[in-house]
């Protein structure tokens, strides 16, 4: 398997989500980082941390992003310019949004999109079931 390079988007898998960052080197990554006791994600801040802190004992993966708008130097520069930023929002400004903005110039989150799509689909199925049951009762 190929290795991540300077400026690549990397991620690690957690139970319900993936955590994204920008790879600097084998011991350094820029990403949204928080305090371990902050279960409500109120203290998330973009930091440059060790790879061990980013991974938290998990496996590292990287994205071969062919949609890159910026070269690797520019990606790292953009990431480092955001260090200290505390604008984290799970739906509109999360770690995946940050990484995609650094690399592709557009804050996007496939995780958020798929979660919203799933919620809409479930809601639609539940509503359709109710409509069918009501029609049968008439």
Regions found by a protein language model. Name each.
Residues 73-138:
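Activation targets extended, charge/polar-rich intrinsically disordered C-terminal tails
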């Amino acid at each position: 398997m190929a290795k991540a390079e300077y400026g690549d988007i990397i991620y690690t898998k957690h139970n319900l989500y993936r955590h994204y960052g920008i790879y600097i080197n084998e011991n350094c990554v820029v990403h949204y980082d928080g305090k371990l006791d902050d279960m409500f994600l109120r203290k998330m801040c973009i930091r440059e941390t060790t790879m061990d802190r980013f991974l938290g004992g998990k496996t590292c993966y990287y994205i071969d992003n062919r949609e890159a708008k910026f070269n690797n130097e520019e990606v790292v520069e953009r990431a480092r310019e955001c260090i200290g930023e505390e604008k984290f929002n799970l739906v509109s400004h999360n770690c995946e949004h940050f990484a995609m903005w650094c690399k592709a110039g557009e804050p996007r989150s496939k995780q958020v999109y798929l979660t919203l799509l799933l919620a809409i689909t479930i809601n639609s199925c539940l509503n359709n079931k109710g409509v069918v049951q009501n029609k049968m009762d008439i």
